[in-house]
Amino acid sequence: MINFDKFYKSNDPCFDFLIDVSSSKEIDQVMKKLNFSSQVHKDAKIYYNKLVLPLHVGETLFSGYTYTKDSVLRGPICYKECAILDTGEYYTVKIDREGFIIQNDIFGRSPIYYCQSLISNRLQLIYLALKSRAALDFNKSYICSIFSVSNSFCQQMTTYDTVIKGVSKLKQREFLIVKENKIYAITDTKKDFQFQEKSVDAYYYYLHRAADEISHSLNSILNSSDNTFLALTGGKDSRVLYAALTAMDRTNDVRIITNDIGYDRAIVTGLVAKFGGNFDFPQEENLLLGNFNINLEKYYSHYFFSKINIPEVYVKDVLPMSDNTISLIGGYCGGVYYDFYKKIGICSDKNRFDKSDVFSFFQKSEFLNQDFLDEYLQQLSKTFQDLTGETWSQKLISHYLEFRNTFHFGARINKANQIDFAPLVSRNLMLASRCLPDVIRDSARISFDLTKIFNEEIAYCQYEIPIVDFSKIPYHKRSKYDGLVLPIVPKLDLIKNRTPLFSNIRKIDIFKEKIKILNNLLTLNKTLGLDDSLNSEKNIKRIEYLVSKRSQNIDKYITALYLSIFFKCNRA
């Protein structure tokens, strides 16, 4: 059984912090045991690790990464004056004359959690703090979020309500102020992206500015590292970045990798053969040897049930590494610019959002615990009402930005010696997306148009999944390639697969390890769990089916069972 009281600090370039406005001696003792530095400012106390220094008014603690004028700023650091952009992945704590100001990046990819008296980047720290004061209560309906629908919608938290009652995830468009022993959530107008239809000219104005932003981000990354890779697929999001590199004449400043196979790989090699670049893989110069069970404990310490699925990369026992820090550029976050969920079946017959539709759609799952369902649906309905937008499409895009994008493309357990960069994070690209009518935005034409700005020919080359003919959709600018799909000639021999240096090292079967844990948890849940419906015949049959298919959806049951036992044991 995982020890949920054991805290593992965040990897670089991040630090961890907790702000307490209650002057709790119990919390002070807990944080001292964790070797956090501390400082009182205006009757509030901040605890932080990694940075051992006194804090002064006007200084800012920075965690994560972002872009400066021509480089990349990496944390953890403390600075007085620094011109940073808001398009990285970070959070900051500024020591203000009246208290503290806590902010995160433009898309909120570095989540912040808070309640009436506490703020932290780590939900587990708030759990430990509340537990020390005997002020802990749980949001037991949280289990329902795991089974609300059977797809990526519920691979992470789905409401602003966390697993701890009274503790919320900070909204993407807000920041926090600590003043006079109180915590205030304030709307940040620079991050409050409203949906408002605008003209074709306005759309392309934003799009061209977004192209400049993305080029700047790419330049900053390339100027900061000589060990940079571009993850290129046959899809549309990473193609934007490849097209940008061709426009900047910097395809030779990155090494291109692709883990995709078949048709996808054929397209990627064809693009590189025609438009330039070189394939390579990171050097495997040493091994990080770990322990599956400890890695799993670290995983739950970091996410503390905010993320439901368990990616293998976070728990594997053998991880090849490069001696030099790797900068990996990917097409992450492209899904925030169109309705990602619509293509996987989450939609409504009605265009206009109605909170009653939340109840009718999300209570369909036969695997939900009916005892907790009503409370969960109330929380989900409240979350949808709070999200930006008036239509179902707009609400789902906003939900994706708040939750799926945060915990899938952000909030990462940073790999040793590697930082994943997302240059598609762009203020102007978001403005361009949100000035389009729903049906046009959801065609995903924005990535096509942006690729076209960088390299018109690349935009019209074939994709892994055929795209629509955008010349027949409004907001189109004419091209000599309209109506065409330019063929790609695969060049598979461009990829020279390197023989793994450590191929003789025995690795455990992660899926088998998960099955062992799942079986143990099912046994424990019969006597130690709060939710015995997880052991029902219906769920057991579902688990057996998932195991037979080696489906990663068993992760949902592992997390749900851990939650059930965790709730019951802490209640006792």
What are the roles of these predicted feature ranges?
Residues 137-144, 385-396, 441-442, 542-560, ...:
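Structural motif
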Residues 164-165, 415, 445-448, 462-467, ...:
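Short coil/turn segments at secondary-structure boundaries
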Residues 145-155, 394-412, 449-453, 552-571:
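Short, hydrophobic/amphipathic alpha-helical patches that form generic packing surfaces
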Residues 4-7, 180, 192-390, 411-458, ...:
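ATP-dependent adenylate-handling active sites, centered on carboxylate activation for C-N bond formation
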Residues 1-232, 240-287:
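Cysteine-centered catalytic environments shared across enzyme families
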Residues 457-551:
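PAPS-dependent sulfotransferase catalytic core
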Residues 125-144, 149-152, 442-475:
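Charge-dense polyanion-binding interfaces
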Residues 2, 10-13, 28, 63, ...:
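An N-terminal alpha-helical hairpin/helix-loop-helix interaction module that forms a charged
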